[in-house]
């Protein structure tokens, strides 16, 4: 069951990234589906224990980090295709975190776990070379992909510490329940002409709904 959940979760992640890449205005689409994700999950907060005080510092830090993650991920897809930007942004962090784990968490993974991470990460990174993408590297796309990779490392470490300071499920629920609201409060101050209205939701309802579902899957 765990293997199935991991695989379907990974596929879902690719799906909402593909829909983001396909969207005409990526910031608007990001605002829309993250807002819908939070609207769907927020009522569940009333059925879970409150997030412990020890976890709130990590929660606030990860919310800020994720604002930058969303902005730069949109930039990635403005300048590069899914088959180029996604493998770099998602493949590199796992390899770097593998090296950082003993220093950050004081833990050493077993050899078979290390090999699994290396094989999967290299498999993702090799997708960059599909369709001859190495011949048409966009420097801006590459730069933004590397920035996103660093951001993913930062929020992965922060979330791991936050989950350890609380219940992992509660921590994730709080994040997904509030993330969309917070991003939509902050985004208008950064992007003056990226308002989203009801007609935008209605026009793109199918893709927004699919992305929202797989975002919280």
State what each model feature region is.
Residues 38-41, 98-102, 112-131:
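Hydrophobic transmembrane alpha-helices of multi-pass small-molecule transport proteins
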Residues 58-65, 107-121, 167-180:
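Alpha-helical transmembrane segments
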Residues 29-30, 85, 171-172:
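Juxtamembrane helix-start motifs in multi-pass secondary transporters
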């Amino acid at each position: 069951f765990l293997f199935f959940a991991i695989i379907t979760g990974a596929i879902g992640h690719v799906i909402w990234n593909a829909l983001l890449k396909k969207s005409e205005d990526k910031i608007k689409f990001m605002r829309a589906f993250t807002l819908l994700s939070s609207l769907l999950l927020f009522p569940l907060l009333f059925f879970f224990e409150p997030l412990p005080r020890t976890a709130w510092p990590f929660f606030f830090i990860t919310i800020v980090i994720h604002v930058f993650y969303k902005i730069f991920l949109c930039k990635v897809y403005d300048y590069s295709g899914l088959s180029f930007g996604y493998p770099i942004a998602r493949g590199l962090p796992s390899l770097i975190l593998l090296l950082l784990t003993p220093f950050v968490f004081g833990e050493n993974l077993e050899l078979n776990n290390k090999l699994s991470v290396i094989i999967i990460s290299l498999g993702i990174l090799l997708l960059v070379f599909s369709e001859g993408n190495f011949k048409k590297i966009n420097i801006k796309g590459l730069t933004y992909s590397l920035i996103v990779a660093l951001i993913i490392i930062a929020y992965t470490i922060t979330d791991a510490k936050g989950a350890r300071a609380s219940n992992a499920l509660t921590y994730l629920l709080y994040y997904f329940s509030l993330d969309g609201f917070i991003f939509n409060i902050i985004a208008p101050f950064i992007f003056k002409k990226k308002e989203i209205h009801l007609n935008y939701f209605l026009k793109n309802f199918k893709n927004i709904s699919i992305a929202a579902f797989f975002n919280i899957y």
